[in-house]
From Swiss-Prot:
Encoding gene per record: dphB
Source species taxonomy: Archaea, Methanobacteriati, Methanobacteriota, Methanomada group, Methanococci
Name this polypeptide is given: Diphthine synthase
Family, as annotated: Belongs to the diphthine synthase family.
Sites where the protein binds S-adenosyl-L-methionine: L9, D85, V88, S113, I114, L164, A207, H232
Disulfide bonds: none
EC supergroup of this enzyme: transferase
The keyword Methyltransferase is annotated on this UniProt entry: yes
Annotated source species: Methanococcus maripaludis (strain C6 / ATCC BAA-1332)
Molecular function via GO: diphthine synthase activity
InterPro entries cross-referenced by the UniProt entry: 4pyrrol_Mease, 4pyrrol_Methylase_sf, 4pyrrole_Mease_sub1, 4pyrrole_Mease_sub2, Dphthn_synthase
Length: 255
């Protein structure tokens, strides 16, 4: 059996009772933190909560190691942990599919993810369009996909959730400031007038914690603001309902 469980967004207290129950029964627990990470806790605290050691998968050998855990799940009860919800990342969906192809029972335990946590913004979830990821630019690698996604969503009046790059193995997490700066640099190159310093944006910091940061304002004012510790994400709002306007006014710190 393969149990795929989410750890939630922030710390070990996000672990569900269902996950705790299965953790007691399984033979071994694996985890990966290359797609997301819990910034409010440590591996030691998670292990203490689950009362069992955790083997963290190596990002460089992920294909080999995930195949290994699937093979183990043929004869043992294996738990695979991820930050957020276990079925949000396509790599995790692939693991579940491959396990089922091999006739392995798969149990999925859902958990809070950024897709549910953005509800704290008061923006209506059904009005979000396609999600995009803003990555750290590298030499000869500066993808412009976020720009295109924002452009397409705005045409339809949809909000855009921009997930910011996580390089957990390097303890490098893109800040909202870096994400906004990256978007402006793409605009400077494309010059299609999709966004500018005058564009309004929302920043969510430390979603899932008891004290998340919610900030709203023009990009030119947000870009130098201190949003404090990660993780951050950016939302480019589309057409706003009057209730959403009230949410941005009263639930956010207006910059």
């Amino acid at each position: 059996m393969l149990v795929m469980a989410g750890l939630g967004l922030y710390d070990e207290r996000d672990v569900t009772l269902k996950t705790l129950d299965f953790a007691k029964k399984v033979d071994k627990i694996y985890a990966e933190f290359y797609t997301a990470i819990l910034t409010g806790t440590t591996m030691e605290k998670v292990e203490e909560t689950l009362q069992k050691p955790i083997t963290v998968l190596n990002r460089e050998k992920v294909e080999y190691e995930t195949n290994k855990l699937i093979e183990e799940a043929k004869n043992k009860d294996i738990m695979f942990l991820t930050a957020g919800d276990p079925m949000v990342a396509t790599t995790h969906v692939d693991i579940a599919v491959e396990a089922r192809k091999k006739g392995i029972e798969v149990v999925i335990i859902n958990a809070p993810s950024i897709y549910s946590a953005i509800g704290i913004t008061g923006l209506q979830l059904y009005k979000f369009g396609k999600t995009t990821s803003v990555v750290f630019p590298e030499p000869n690698y500066f993808p412009e996909t976020p720009y295109d996604v924002i452009k397409d969503n705005l045409k339809l009046g949809y909000h855009t959730l921009c997930l910011l790059d996580i390089q957990a193995d390097k303890e490098r997490f893109m800040t909202a400031n870096e994400g906004l700066d990256t978007l402006l640099k793409i605009e400077e190159k494309r010059n299609e007038k999709v966004i500018s310093g005058e564009t309004y944006a929302a920043v969510v910091a430390r979603a899932g914690s008891t004290k998340p940061g919610l900030y709203y304002g023009k990009i030119k004012d947000l870009i130098n603001y201190d949003f404090k510790s990660p993780l951050h994400c950016v939302i480019i709002p589309g057409k706003l309902h009057f209730m959403e306007e009230d949410a941005l006014k009263y639930l956010f710190e207006n910059i």
